């Protein structure tokens, strides 16, 4: 499992960097895990150069038995009885007159639980689009009502692969609503806006990265299988969001080092965190091409593992993600024992998230990053 989670994290950070290049100061929110899952389904049907480019970009070339590992990971993440709701759903929507190889359909069904729904793109592409959106809306509890905008599919569309992920978790330690106050949030050195700032003082895993002058806070969700981890610089030092330096150093190795339990200490922390809600949409063709996935989106695509016809390529990889963080906990969706100590001399730390920060929601047992974002403006 470790190999796969390392590959998924490397890809998550590469994609974050690619999105950052085209949007250096705005909000970013994605579910890298959802995107990796959807691309892994496509990978099942790729051959030749197309397969090599995708494997390399997703860092799957370092992982043995990639698909069976995904299968166990999906089962682990979707496990019932967990104290949070986390739903991962995959589906293929195929043109009903087009012949897909039975082996491909059997593999996606077995490994990713993805059924093929036959739709009529050829004669009724608008109805097909609505059916796909309706399915995603249902899987994400209404949070993503329109994954595919009008015109994204047409009569030439053969296949749409959809991955939807939905998460709702309550904080292990909730914020009291009455402690929430209006407070300024600094967007950069010059500008600020008023936000609803939540507050609580409890013991949390806390760390400090000296060379980056950055605080690390882990806020566990009930059950502790999932946590939100926040990287907050002490101040805004650059001319943008203040996150440049951290973003330049974001690698799998660094991230593991900064956030591993041995490097975090359970301390009393005064946590000030804004309530926020992000809804972001991405066309991932350009960022993926930047990461080396080039043949998939055009006539050079080799998808002969999906169909014998040579005319199949992936026209678009669309991703939408939603997150809401409040006093109770977090709701997010995307498509693609403390020991009591005398409290006399407990050192206290302040964690005042009143300027931009990077955050991610991690599945702790597998170390997979399910959601990753930058909050520049709540």
From Swiss-Prot:
Question: What does this protein do, in the record's words?
Answer: Neutrophil serine protease inhibitor that plays an essential role in the regulation of the innate immune response, inflammation and cellular homeostasis. Acts primarily to protect the cell from proteases released in the cytoplasm during stress or infection. These proteases are important in killing microbes but when released from granules, these potent enzymes also destroy host proteins and contribute to mortality. Regulates the activity of the neutrophil proteases elastase, cathepsin G, proteinase-3, chymase, chymotrypsin, and kallikrein-3. May be cleaved leading to a loss of its anti-protease activity and to the appearance of an endonuclease activity. However no catalytic site was identified.
Task: Name the residues annotated as site: Reactive bond.
Answer: 343-344
Q: Which GO terms describe its molecular function?
A: serine-type endopeptidase inhibitor activity
Q: Which CDD domains match?
A: serpinB1_LEI (cd19560)
Sites of N-acetylmethionine modification: 1
Sites where Phosphoserine occurs are at 299
Report the main location listed first in the record. Answer: secreted
Q: Where, per UniProt, does this protein localize?
A: Secreted; Cytoplasm; Cytolytic granule; Early endosome
Matching entries from PANTHER family are given as:
LEUKOCYTE ELASTASE INHIBITOR, SERINE PROTEASE INHIBITOR, SERPIN
Lineage, top-rank taxon, reads Eukaryota
Family in the record: Belongs to the serpin family. Ov-serpin subfamily.
Note the PROSITE patterns from the entry: SERPIN (PS00284)
Q: What is this protein called?
A: Leukocyte elastase inhibitor
Region annotated CARD-binding motif (CBM) sits at: 350-378
* UniProt KW keywords: Acetylation, Cytoplasm, Disulfide bond, Endosome, Lysosome, Phosphoprotein, Protease inhibitor, Secreted, Serine protease inhibitor
Post-translational modification N6-acetyllysine, affected residues:
137
Q: Name one GO biological process term.
A: negative regulation of interleukin-1 beta production
Q: List the GO terms this entry assigns under cellular component, sorted alphabetically.
A: cytolytic granule; early endosome; extracellular space
Coiled coil region boundaries: none
Q: How does it assemble?
A: Monomer. Interacts (via C-terminus) with CASP1; CASP4 (via CARD domain) and CASP5; these interactions regulate the activity of inflammatory caspases. Interacts with PRTN3. Interacts with GZMH.
């Amino acid at each position: 499992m470790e190999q796969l989670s390392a590959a998924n994290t490397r890809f998550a950070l590469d994609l974050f960097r690619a999105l950052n290049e085209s949007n250096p100061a705005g909000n970013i929110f994605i579910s890298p895990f959802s995107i990796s899952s959807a691309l892994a389904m496509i990978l099942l049907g790729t051959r030749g150069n197309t397969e090599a480019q995708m494997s390399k970009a997703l860092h799957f070339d370092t992982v043995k038995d990639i698909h069976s590992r995904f299968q166990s990971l999906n089962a682990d993440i979707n496990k019932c009885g967990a104290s949070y709701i986390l739903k991962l759903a995959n589906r293929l929507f195929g043109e009903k007159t087009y012949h897909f190889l039975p082996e491909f359909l059997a593999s996606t069904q077995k490994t990713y639980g993805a059924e093929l729904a036959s739709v009529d793109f050829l004669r009724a592409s608008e109805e097909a689009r609505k059916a796909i959106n309706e399915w995603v809306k249902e899987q994400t509890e209404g949070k993503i009502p329109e994954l595919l905008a009008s015109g994204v599919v047409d009569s030439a569309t053969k296949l749409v692969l959809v991955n939807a992920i939905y998460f709702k978790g309550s904080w292990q330690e909730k914020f009291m609503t009455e402690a929430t106050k209006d407070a300024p949030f600094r967007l950069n050195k010059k500008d600020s806006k008023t936000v609803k700032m939540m507050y609580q003082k409890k013991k949390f895993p806390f760390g400090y990265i000296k060379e980056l002058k950055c605080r690390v806070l882990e806020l566990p969700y009930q059950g502790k299988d999932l946590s939100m981890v926040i990287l907050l610089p002490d101040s805004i030092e650059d001319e943008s969001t203040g996150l440049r330096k951290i973003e330049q150093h974001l690698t799998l190795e660094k991230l593991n080092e900064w956030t591993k339990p041995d490097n975090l200490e359970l301390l009393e922390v005064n946590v000030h965190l804004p309530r926020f809600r992000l809804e972001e949409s991405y066309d991932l063709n350009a960022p993926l091409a930047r990461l080396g996935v080039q043949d998939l989106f055009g006539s050079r695509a080799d998808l002969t593992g999906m169909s014998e016809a040579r005319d199949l390529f992936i026209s678009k990889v669309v991703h939408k993600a939603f997150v809401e963080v409040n006093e109770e906990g977090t709701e997010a969706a995307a498509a693609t024992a403390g020991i009591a100590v005398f409290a006399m001399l407990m050192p206290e730390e302040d964690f005042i998230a009143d300027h931009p920060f990077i955050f991610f929601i991690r599945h702790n047992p597998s170390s997979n990053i399910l959601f990753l974002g930058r909050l520049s403006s709540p």
